[in-house]
Structures are given as structure tokens and as C-alpha cells.
């Protein structure tokens, strides 16, 4: 029976860690999912994109006064004016994030429940490491050993340099993004601090 030993997990774990100040309890095998649940997960991305597109349209119409004001007010609550101005600028208006990260709860009988829908790539490096590591003994793991890495890389134009910008507030995610950038190639991917980041005009 295939399994990942604690020693092999420790040996594969990056010395710099994957998530700052966290420790992990790891399983000797991947969490099993039924074929029907896998199909449901694989179809989730398209449905979530449609949901976000509709939500964005509702927000934009509310901002313009074509729908009730409370819609935009609810979305805008607690956000600084500078962020609101940037989010409403023509450069990003109507754009849907390329990374959608739902937080899913798996129930015994009722299937999946979504508690949050995020659009930042936190967790991609960690999940990619899990896939790479477990695929050594379980080659049929969902996505294979490189699925998460190749999927992340594919959202950017081929050959284009990619800056992964991490804020101090989200610094806990930086180790996994450093690991991911190394796996994908430092000549193309680099990790930068958001607070000091400047776009290279070249």
C-alpha cells in the first residue's frame, strides 16, 4: 500500500517553510474524493466566474445609480477611498480575477458549502507543494505533480516576466510564493514587497 512517510515529508519540506509561523499535521496519503465530487469541483471555476461577472455588473450599475445604492454601499463598506478609486478606474473596471480561491466546507451528506470566495493566489504554492510531494507515491492525485504550478503559470502570457506582489499584511504567504517562483523559474517569476513595489517601465 502506497503512503508518504513522515521522514519523506520532512525531507521534502522547504527549509524556508511554506507559510510563515505555521506548523502542519500531515497525512500519509491524499484526502480521498469521490469521482462525483471531483467532477463538481472541476466545474466550479466556470460557475464562480459567471457569479463574479454578475456581481461586478450589479455593483457597477449601483455605482451609476441604475440600481439601489445599498448594493455598492455594502461592497464598499470599510474600504479606503484610495482603494475604491483604484477599483473603479477604467484600467481594472469589469476585469475578473484570474485566480479564484473558494473556501469550501465538505459536509457528510449535503455536499459542498462555500464560506468565502477570494481572488488572491494565497495557498497556490502550498497546494502545489502538496501535489508535487504526494504525486511521488500517488501519481493519480488530482492535478498531478505539476497541475497547480502549470495552471498558475498559464494565466500569464508566455515569456512575459511576472512579479508576484505580496503586502506586509499578507507576509505569511510570502514563503510559499518564494518557493513557487523558484519552481517556475526565477528568470521569469520574482516575488516583491507591495509597499515598495514600482513597475519597471522596461
Question: Model-found features: residue ranges?
Answer:
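Preference for protein termini
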Residues: 1-202
Amino acid at each position: 500500500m502506497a503512503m508518504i512517510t513522515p521522514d519523506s515529508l520532512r525531507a521534502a519540506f522547504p527549509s524556508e517553510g511554506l507559510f510563515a509561523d505555521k506548523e502542519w499535521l500531515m497525512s500519509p496519503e491524499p484526502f480521498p474524493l469521490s469521482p462525483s465530487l471531483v467532477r463538481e469541483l472541476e466545474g466550479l471555476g466556470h460557475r464562480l466566474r459567471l457569479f463574479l461577472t454578475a456581481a461586478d455588473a450589479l455593483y457597477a450599475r449601483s455605482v451609476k445609480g441604475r440600481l439601489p445604492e445599498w448594493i455598492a454601499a455594502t461592497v464598499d463598506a470599510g474600504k479606503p477611498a484610495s482603494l475604491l478609486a483604484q477599483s473603479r478606474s477604467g484600467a481594472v473596471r469589469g476585469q475578473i480575477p484570474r485566480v479564484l480561491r473558494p473556501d469550501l466546507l465538505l459536509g457528510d451528506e449535503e455536499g459542498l458549502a462555500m464560506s468565502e470566495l477570494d481572488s488572491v493566489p494565497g495557498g497556490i504554492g502550498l497546494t502545489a507543494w502538496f501535489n508535487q510531494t504526494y504525486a511521488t507515491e500517488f501519481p493519480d492525485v488530482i492535478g498531478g505533480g505539476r497541475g497547480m504550478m502549470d495552471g498558475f503559470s498559464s494565466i500569464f502570457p508566455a515569456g512575459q516576466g511576472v512579479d508576484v506582489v505580496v503586502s506586509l499584511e499578507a507576509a505569511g504567504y510570502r514563503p510559499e510564493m518564494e518557493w513557487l517562483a523558484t519552481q517556475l523559474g526565477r528568470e521569469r517569476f520574482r516575488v516583491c514587497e507591495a509597499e515598495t513595489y514600482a513597475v519597471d517601465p522596461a
